[in-house]
Design a protein with these regions (language model features):
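Bacterial Sec-dependent N-terminal signal peptides
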Residues: 1-25, 237
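Charge-biased low-complexity segments
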Residues: 24-237
Length: 237
């Protein structure tokens, strides 16, 4: 009995000591996203413990835990309206819950090669974190091409990701599509926030395969109050 009591006292002391060594830090991870996370007092680079990410409206889009700098256990992802849209288990690398985000401006399409197959069973690739969070990790309206902002009609903007059969991002481009303006800009995949790289691969008949996952967002150029500036609406009014 005494040994049991001593064990629990020691365990509680260790947990208290660990908590005392943790501090909260804050870092901007994208133009409109801020990450709040716990680290060791003496090593701010390694995340330990709780973490959550908020948008410019201070709405929480992601929440989970880190262990030794890696995502651990269950992470929850939310829409901009606060609805739970995805749950992912990083310990077991398993998608537990995933529903369409009805409130996001981001639409999705995917491309999977099924040439030569008869009635294949195709499961589209999935962005871990959801489309809305994944898009805003990379989007900054200040980086829109001047030629796009100078157009007189609305433009479809596509973020096209090449996803490997293991779920790795192998390529990334931004395409602008309209009647008179059609351009593809290849993007570097180096030094992005780590969440931007996280995908679940597509499958064909149960086998993981390469694919393309595409975010689609309309740029309502015709509604811009200051034509030619970076202030281009992504919502139709």
């Amino acid at each position: 009995m005494k040994k049991t009591i001593v064990f629990f006292i020691t365990l509680l002391f260790c947990q208290f000591a660990n908590a005392q060594n943790l501090v909260w830090r804050k870092m901007r991870v994208a133009h409109t996203l801020v990450e709040n996370y716990e680290t060791d007092k003496n090593n701010k680079k390694v995340r330990l413990g709780e973490c959550f990410i908020v948008n410019s409206s201070n709405r929480e889009l992601a929440r989970g835990k880190y262990k030794n700098g890696l995502k651990d256990s269950i992470w929850n992802y939310f829409s901009a309206n606060g609805d739970l849209v995805q749950v992912y288990d990083f310990t077991n690398k398993k998608l537990l819950y995933n529903i369409p985000d009805e409130g996001t401006i981001v639409k999705q399409r995917s491309e999977v090669d099924t040439a030569g197959l008869v009635k294949p069973k195709v499961v589209a690739p999935v962005k871990i974190g959801g489309l809305n969070y994944g898009f805003y990790l990379l989007y900054n309206e200040r980086n829109l091409p001047q030629a796009a902002k100078d157009q007189k009609e609305d433009i479809l903007m596509e973020y096209v990701f090449d996803v490997s059969a293991t779920g790795k991002m192998e390529g990334f481009s931004i395409n602008y599509i309209s009647t008179f303006y059609n351009v593809e800009f290849k993007q570097s995949i180096k030094d992005l926030h780590q969440d931007a790289y996280e995908f679940i691969p597509a499958t064909v008949n149960g086998k993981p395969v390469k694919s393309k996952l595409v975010y689609q967002v309309m740029l309502y150029i015709s509604q811009a109050r200051d034509r030619g500036t970076y202030n281009i609406p992504t919502h139709k009014y």
